Amino acid sequence: MDKQRIFEVLITNICEVLPELDGHRFEPEDQLVELGADSVDRAEIITMVLEDLSLKIPRIELSGVKNIGELAEVLYDKVQSA
């Protein structure tokens, strides 16, 4: 799975949790908080993405991520090493 596909999985799950963002033009620099995701939304998005990617990693490994582009990068690295 390539980085673009992981980014698409992220976007799909973001839009599922935050349907008001459907049609939004997502950029790697977008931050979930700025997009309107509260802590529960963010946890749900992460859980759904990890499930979609069949990853089991501690959430703490994602804590330093600043935006969805960085999140896609970290997830890509985890998929490659899984």
Swiss-Prot record:
Family matches, as Gene3D superfamilies: ACP-like
PTM note: 4'-phosphopantetheine is transferred from CoA to a specific serine of apo-ACP by sfp.
Cysteine-cysteine disulfides: none
One annotated Gene Ontology cellular component of this protein: cytosol
Any one Gene Ontology molecular-function term assigned to this protein's record: acyl carrier activity
Originating species: Bacillus subtilis (strain 168)
Localization of this protein: Cytoplasm
Carrier domain segment(s): 4-79
Pfam families in alphabetical order: PP-binding
Keywords from the UniProt entry: Antibiotic biosynthesis, Cytoplasm, Phosphopantetheine, Phosphoprotein
Function per UniProt: Involved in some intermediate steps for the synthesis of the antibiotic polyketide bacillaene which is involved in secondary metabolism.
Protein name per its UniProtKB record: Polyketide biosynthesis acyl-carrier-protein AcpK
Signal peptide per UniProt: none
Pathway(s) served: Antibiotic biosynthesis; bacillaene biosynthesis
GO biological process, one term: antibiotic biosynthetic process
InterPro entries attached to this UniProt entry: ACP-like_sf, PP-bd_ACP
O-(pantetheine 4'-phosphoryl)serine: modified positions: 39
